[in-house]
Design a protein with these regions (language model features):
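Flexible, surface-exposed loop/linker segments and immediately adjacent secondary-structure boundaries
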Residues: 96-126
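An acidic-aromatic
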Residues: 55-104, 162-168
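Sec-dependent signal peptide recognition
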Residues: 2-9
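Short, exposed beta-strand/loop patches in secreted or surface proteins that constitute
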Residues: 33, 56-59, 73-74, 118-123
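Short, hydrophobic/aromatic-rich segments at coil-to-beta transitions
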Residues: 38-43, 61-67, 126-131, 152-157
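Soluble periplasmic/extracytoplasmic beta-strand elements of cell-envelope proteins
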Residues: 41-43, 82, 131, 147, ...
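N-terminal leader/targeting segments and the immediate start of mature chains
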Residues: 5, 16-52, 63-64, 89, ...
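Non-transmembrane domains of secretory- and envelope-associated proteins
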Residues: 124-127, 135-143, 150-200
Length: 200
């Protein structure tokens, strides 16, 4: 009886480990699909109980991104974030945290998932859905659901939980691009009348 119990425990343990490995493999392939050397561009929609709703375009190259919505334009060069608010012609300069970046850049999960999360995965139709649960209580992002296209391995939806509120990004029209590093930095020449406020 004891041997049977141990065998069952080992079986289910190995199954759960296998599912976690499969989920990690899917996320690794997903991260690789959006880590093109010269960058990618996409359209996105954000629905958030905490931050409101918006839509726009995003360009990503490694850790760098720029996002444009009707209200704001953001540039992040991997260290510094510039946020231009069109309603008051003002640019705020900050050094954001990873959790802050996550609600600005739906692709930022590729910089987060490898440490501090437990994985599980389901499949539905032409997509994988990977569920990530934080194993570190100090993480501001407690849960994430990443929906990944089975054919392209591009993420089509990123859903994350912060402060007990969900934010959902829907991503479409992904395409490769040739983007220079300069495209991810604010250029004052393009906004000559903007007031720059350094909050670092």
């Amino acid at each position: 009886m004891k041997r049977l119990f141990m065998a069952i425990t080992l079986f289910f343990g190995s199954c759960l480990f296998g599912f976690a490995q499969d989920a990690k493999t899917i996320l690794d392939k997903c991260a690789a699909s959006v880590s093109a050397k010269n960058g990618i561009q996409a359209d996105f929609t954000m629905n958030s109980a905490q931050y409101g709703n918006s839509s726009g375009k995003i360009s990503v190259k490694g850790r760098m991104f720029t996002a444009t919505t009707p209200m704001a334009t953001l540039w992040f060069d991997g260290k510094t974030l510039w946020t231009y608010m069109s309603n008051n012609d003002e640019v705020n300069v900050t050094t954001p945290s990873e959790s802050q970046l996550q609600v600005m850049n739906p692709y930022n999960f590729i910089n987060m998932y490898k440490k501090g999360f437990r994985y599980s995965m389901t499949q539905s139709g032409n997509a994988y859905q990977v569920h990530l649960t934080a194993t570190d209580a100090s993480k501001r992002v407690k849960e994430m659901f990443i929906t990944v296209d089975k054919k392209t391995y591009h993420p089509t939806e990123v859903k994350l939980l912060q402060k007990q509120k969900w934010t959902t990004f829907t991503i479409k029209n992904v395409k490769a691009a040739k983007l220079s590093d300069a495209a991810f930095r604010f250029n004052s020449k393009d906004f000559p009348s903007a007031e720059v406020i350094d909050l670092r």
